[in-house]
A protein has these predicted regions:
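Interaction/scaffold regions that mediate signaling and macromolecular assembly across diverse proteins
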Residues: 1-195
Length: 195
């Protein structure tokens, strides 16, 4: 029979992650020459995300096409946090595959891990700032969609969406700090070193 939406989404997340791992293994040891990225970085692999095509489900797709045309249409921005990009700045790759019946719980765990990992989210009450992974700014429309209709905070839809995504995983004191709405919002520089 037809696959459920959860099974299809789990399939594409798992495929993406497996293809990243395969590309890294095939290119290892990575010794790039581009000064733009660290020498041992997935970004030193030619065409890593947008150029290299992979045979998957009877199609030839790049990692970028898998993310944009197969994963994004499900409309769940948490899925972008489930993608391992082979970089230190990426969310932690799970030690188990995503599964249809556990997908909701697994995606909630991905967000909780992301929100409580300082290189992804730093809530600094002393400095009155929230610094989040640049990853959240790469797909602003996806995360802004979580913002809801209340724009009385004076914040952008993206900032409100990010706060609504991460707040449930934070400590009560951090949630209270976010509710005060006095913080500066900025992004960590993405760490492209190989993880």
């Amino acid at each position: 029979g037809a696959w459920s939406a959860e099974r299809r989404l789990a399939y594409w997340i798992n495929a993406y992650n497996a293809l990243v791992l395969r590309a890294v293994i095939e290119a290892y040891p990575i010794r790039g020459t581009s000064a733009e990225f660290p020498a041992a970085s997935v970004m030193q692999i030619p065409g890593m995300f947008a150029g290299r095509e992979h045979q998957i489900a009877g199609e030839r797709l790049t990692l970028e096409l898998i993310e944009e045309e197969r994963i994004a249409p499900f409309g769940d921005p948490r899925a972008h946090l489930a993608l391992g990009r082979g970089a230190v700045g990426s969310p932690r790759l799970r030690s188990e595959p995503f599964r249809e019946l556990e997908l909701e719980t697994q995606l909630e765990a991905v967000v909780a891990d992301f929100a409580t990992t300082p290189r992804h989210v730093t809530v600094d009450r002393a400095a009155d700032q929230v610094v989040v992974s640049a990853l959240l700014g790469w797909r602003p429309d996806r995360f802004a969609g979580l913002a809801g209709a209340d724009d009385s905070t004076g914040r952008s839809a993206l900032e409100r969406g990010v706060v609504s995504l991460i707040a449930p995983a934070l400590f009560p004191s951090e949630r209270a700090f976010l509710a005060e709405n006095t913080f500066r919002f900025s992004y960590h520089e993405f760490d492209w070193r190989l993880n």
